[in-house]
Amino acid sequence: MMKIIFMGTPDFSATVLKGLLDSGQYEVLAVVTQPDRAVGRKREIRMTPVKELALEYKLPVYQPEKLAKSSDLEELMNLEADGIVTAAFGQFLPSCLLDSVDFAVNVHASLLPKYRGGAPIHYALINGDEQAGVTIMEMVKEMDAGDMIASKATPIEETDNVGTLFEKLALIGRDLLLDVLPAYRAGQIIPQPQDPSQVTFSPNISPEEERIDWSKTNRQIFNQIRGMYPWPVAHTLLQGQRFKIYEADMMAGSGQPGQILSISKKELVVAAGKGALSLKTVQPAGKPKMAIVDFLNGLGRSLSLGDTFGK
């Protein structure tokens, strides 16, 4: 049975880890994940999804803030694992650790060499791509730059958002890894280098990128909103206060960008630079997330035609 160290953090990673564990082909000697963090409005300390799963399976868990500078590093190297599997871990692996195993592979949620970095799923949606995918690649010191072992694509649907696409790609990544890892270890797959001329990056979303620019087309804003749902969430200003928009639909319409074109007890339509958007799920400052109907029958009653978002 192949002995591996698994490294990952979010739900995407947990899906891959569970696939390895349930396959019965791998002995997971240790799981490495990010430290517990404070999350949500109440800043409650929560374990990562990978840690929760590892504890369920009674696996040793390591949570170094920086693996390269951690005392855990030597202990991991002494485990004498055959290989390392990573999936959305969020840290670089030290060369000494990579050199201590026979193989190290990463499950990355993009069709490399496109979208190296930490937010490939977000950018695939924000940029309006027609497809996304997963690549299994060899680990090297440079971020997501290793030779590609296998990849698989899937269409992006109009109804997809970050959450739904994460779920789809996690399952694809799990199955693809289980399909190709034995053949790769047997030398039956020759990894292919990435084309340097086709490399693009997907760094973590910045606060500036979360803000909606109403002068953009309704398609661009629609893609931004779904490319940040359920996190980090696109936002604008309304009456000087932050106003988050979780979901919206594209509509025909014209007016000054950000201007309210139509308002009723059930619908709120806002002009974009081209076309318009009907807001569906929102969150006013200091309030919980709510359906647009609830907003319009509460705080939204003070709004009227011609009021403008973004100010």
Curated annotation (Swiss-Prot):
InterPro entries, sorted: Fmt, Formyl_trans_C, Formyl_trans_C_sf, Formyl_transf_N, Formyl_transf_N_sf, Formyl_transferase-like_C_sf, GART_AS, Met-tRNA-FMT_C
Pfam families: Formyl_trans_C (PF02911), Formyl_trans_N (PF00551)
Binding site for (6S)-5,6,7,8-tetrahydrofolate: S110, L111, L112, P113
NCBIfam families named in the record: fmt
Protein role: Attaches a formyl group to the free amino group of methionyl-tRNA(fMet). The formyl group appears to play a dual role in the initiator identity of N-formylmethionyl-tRNA by promoting its recognition by IF2 and preventing the misappropriation of this tRNA by the elongation apparatus.
PANTHER family noted in UniProt: METHIONYL-TRNA FORMYLTRANSFERASE, METHIONYL-TRNA FORMYLTRANSFERASE, MITOCHONDRIAL
Name this protein carries in UniProt: Methionyl-tRNA formyltransferase
Native species: Streptococcus sanguinis (strain SK36)
